[in-house]
Regions:
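Intrinsically disordered, low-complexity activation-like regions
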Residues: 1-73, 78-152
Length: 152
C-alpha cells in the first residue's frame, strides 16, 4: 500500500460521508484496512511520504484521522497526534498548502486544530482565514485551548 491508496480511500464519495459522522462499521473498516499502515507510520517507517504534497497529506490522515476512527474513545486515538502536527508544519513550511485543493487543505490543517498548543491553534486560525474557509470551528477550537489550556 502506498500514499495514493490512502488518498483514494479518504477522498472517495463513501468516505467523505463519514468524515465527521462515522459509524462503528466505518471505524472497523478503517482499522482492518489501515492499522498496519498506522503502526508503520507511528514507527517513522513512512517518513519518506513527506517528500510530496500528497504523501504528506496521506501521512497526516494516517497519523491524525485514522486513529480517531480505529481507537475511538481511547487514549490511543491521540497517540500519533504530535507526529501529525510535525508533518503538517513541515508541509506548510514547504508551501504544500499552495498546491493542495480545498478538501485536502482541511485535512492538512486538521492536526493543528486538534493540538492543545495555543501556537498551533493560532497558526490554524490564520490558515483558515488565509484560504477563506469557514473559520467558526477553527476559532472555536482555539478559544477552548486559550481558555482551558487543553480540550476538556
Amino acid at each position: 500500500m502506498n500514499h495514493s491508496d490512502v488518498i483514494k480511500y479518504w477522498f472517495s464519495e463513501k468516505s467523505r460521508q463519514h468524515w465527521f459522522f462515522s459509524t462503528p462499521e466505518i471505524d472497523n473498516e478503517i482499522k482492518q484496512r489501515y492499522e498496519q499502515i498506522w503502526i508503520r507510520a507511528a514507527s517513522g517507517e513512512l517518513n519518506g511520504w513527506q517528500d510530496s504534497p500528497q504523501g504528506c497529506l496521506a501521512l497526516i490522515i494516517v497519523l491524525d484521522q485514522f486513529p480517531l476512527n480505529m481507537f475511538r474513545g481511547t487514549a490511543k486515538s491521540f497517540q500519533t497526534e504530535e507526529m501529525a502536527v510535525e508533518v503538517a508544519l513541515k508541509a506548510i513550511k514547504k508551501s504544500y498548502d499552495e498546491i493542495l485543493n480545498t478538501d485536502e487543505l482541511l485535512f492538512l490543517f486538521m492536526p493543528l486544530m486538534h493540538s492543545e498548543n495555543i501556537e498551533h491553534q493560532n497558526i490554524q486560525v490564520k490558515l483558515f482565514e488565509k484560504y477563506d474557509f469557514n473559520d467558526e470551528y477553527s476559532k472555536h477550537h482555539r478559544n477552548i485551548v486559550k481558555r482551558f489550556g487543553r480540550f476538556p
